[in-house]
Amino acid sequence: MNFLRPHLRALVPAALRRRVRDGLESVRWRFPAPPRALPQYGLTTTQVYPQGTNFDLVMERALAGKLEGLRLSARTPVASIGTCFAEEFAQFMQAGGMNYVRTEPDALASSASWGRVYTIPNLLQIVRYSLEPDFPLVLERSAGGYFDPLRDHAPLPSASEAEARDAVRRHREASRKAFAECEIAVITVGQNEAWIDRTSGMVWGRMPPKEVLEPRRASFEVREFSLSENRAALEQALDALKRANPALRFLLTVSPVPSFASFSDSDVVSRSFANKCLLRALVDEAVAARSGHAFYFPSFEMVLCYNPTSFRADNRHVKYGSVDRIFGLLERTTGLARPRSSG
């Protein structure tokens, strides 16, 4: 048969051959061989990249050992805080009737009324105002009334400044209680761009509303946090929580949800994933430095690495269709585009 192959290749157009190859890879992806080890190198099945639908099976085997020290059961008091993907965890815990800590109502099912916590510096602010009685209480005023700018999806604005201050104090006590009552804190990091009040130095929980931003635009800046800024903020947040609750264990995750928009770059897709890589590296450092009480759950990898549309059956190499898309974009955005014949 081998002698026929060159003749068949000459008869079948290259584009068709590539499509057929991608189709065969999709079939192979659905019916992989069992997970393999490489004993000659001392590697187990969880150390060799999983092929096809073996992905979840191999991940399960790997995590069974890594998460053993977490000691998480349906009865373990758990709190969660973080980006929109943290909502999914909260809803999963509550739907299953598990011991999910909630110390006050929250529109997004969080353990306290934190809303979505997008950045690590914003997380640190929440930890600090929960544990430090003298942390500044900052209020802003919009058309609806007074509100807490440090939180996303905070309750409705209060009619008076006094009411708003009382509401923030109650929230901060509920926040402190949530961190104190849990045995495991699930922290999901996900974004790296925030609005900063230049006057107070506070990181806002979300973009300032139009009626606040427009007359004071010079008072605000959009900041993308550096590796060192994020590292320092994450270390301070985890260390402060551990001092306040010495038995506390951490389950850290990185949200797979990209940025909705970027004020820091004209290319939101590339900027978003550059920030994801930065956050993923920081979480890896934090877990390694806190062996025995900090653990990582790979929700980020489970979403982005499980991609039979783009990957071949080995879940590593890229299908021809995706290769064509990649280099088609390179041609269209550079001077590499092939000149078309005028005829």
PLM region spans:
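Extracellular glycan-modifying ectodomains
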Residues: N2-G343
